[in-house]
Amino acid sequence: MMGLADDGGLLVPNELPFVESNLDKWRTLSFTELSLEIMLLFTSGRIPREELMSMVKKSYASFRHPEITPVKSVGKLHVLELFHGPTFAFKDVALQFLGNLFAYFLTKRNHPLRILGATSGDTGSAVSYTHLTLPTSDLV
């Protein structure tokens, strides 16, 4: 595992899956159902569907809104609320799932995860909270 790409940039997929044919079907899905469908495109069968759904549900169980990231409309303006996570940071949306993803693969390999945190920003609190709840991680 690595934090940055060899060139110092972010890690991104070589190609993105084609999803246009799924958009109409996805329109009616809940946040967790949609998350599952999207993550299935990127996990290439490495995580069984049932386990991935369990991971998605666990990741967002601590969010304070039943829709996880509800959309609020004010006239013609639509706003996606990303602050309902455990630390109120928008980063909770990604990091809650990422922590569970790390835990899944590290548990399969029987490896612990140790995190040394040194930050005062919202990323640090979002990462810290994620790993406080994982049995395979230690946070310093």
Spans of features found by a protein language model:
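Charged, compositionally biased N-terminal leader segments and the immediate start
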Residues: 1-7
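A conserved hydrophobic secondary-structure block that centers on an alpha-helix together
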Residues: 109-118
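Conserved small/polar residues in nucleotide/adenosyl-binding loops
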Residues: 130-136
